Amino acid sequence: MANLPPIIISTLDRDRLYALLEHHQEDPEVVKHLYDELDRAECRPLKEMPDNVVTLHRWAYFKNQDNGREHRLMLVMPTDVGEGPDRLSILSPVGAALLGLSVGASIDWPSKGKVLRLTLINVA
């Protein structure tokens, strides 16, 4: 994937994800991309994270540029998906793509044989 936008990940999220990925082999493509994202990310302590960046347990408002649909989802660990509506696992292709993005950034992300183009609209 060329021209990837810069991403910022909290050290807390980074540590949680490394621990998760060590034991997850169900979707090797997503796991590989998450490792790549963690390797290229700027990591900061949680208290230094900008408000406009997607982290775990924050609402991400984004647009799928392929179909024009807007979505609001909370990025969570796989074990937290059932805790409420609109929860999105970090191990899903869209969840992996959104992690660390800043408002206004777009990313092309492989998913099930095609490429999704997502643009982050807001974070809450």
Predicted features and spans:
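N-terminal beta-hairpin/loop module of FHA
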Residues: 33-36, 73, 79
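Short, structured beta-strand/loop micro-motifs enriched in basic residues and often containing a Trp
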Residues: 42, 82-93
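Histidine- and aromatic-rich ligand-binding microenvironments
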Residues: 47, 93, 114
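FKBP-type peptidyl-prolyl cis-trans isomerase
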Residues: 54-65, 70, 74-76, 103-124
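A short acidic, glycine/proline-enriched capping/turn motif at secondary-structure boundaries
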Residues: 67, 79-82, 95
